[in-house]
């Protein structure tokens, strides 16, 4: 969004219910927020539905935005929460680990503290494709921790799980991503 004054005019127009302002805001953020939705929801149509629902929430809450922080970050948080709500509604316990966890807490902590995957060296689409292959539980925790910079405590509160489950899901997500990427690059080299 170009500058704070321009943004403020658009937001004020949206709060007044002006369609032109709502359309301008939607068009400016649509692409970025759709990418956010795709990180959580693998199905294209479902991701677009989540995005629509998220923007409805954004428009409903615009009057509460105080311009003290990043507007895009504020919108992103609403979209992420909408995606998480959608996943939660579609599965019984989607954020609990997919397998029984036999990890000892120290091992999980050690794995989490290891160096982050070097996604900067990968093309974005390769990384997103690999992330999309993770289970909903692993993908969601990975996205929230690595891409959205939430802490394990915040993730646990958002998803209704304990911190240990968040750490375990992140560790397993990283292991699965390493396996997925190794297989992909092994296939490419062959």
Model regions: which residues?
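Internal acidic/polar
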Residues: 4, 93-119, 151
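Short, Lys/Arg-enriched C-terminal cap helix and immediately downstream tail that follows
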Residues: 88, 134, 139, 171-190
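A short, charge-rich alpha-helical start-of-domain segment used by transcription regulators
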Residues: 11-35
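Structural recognition of an alpha-helix C-terminal capping motif at a helix-to-coil junction
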Residues: 35, 49-56, 69-81
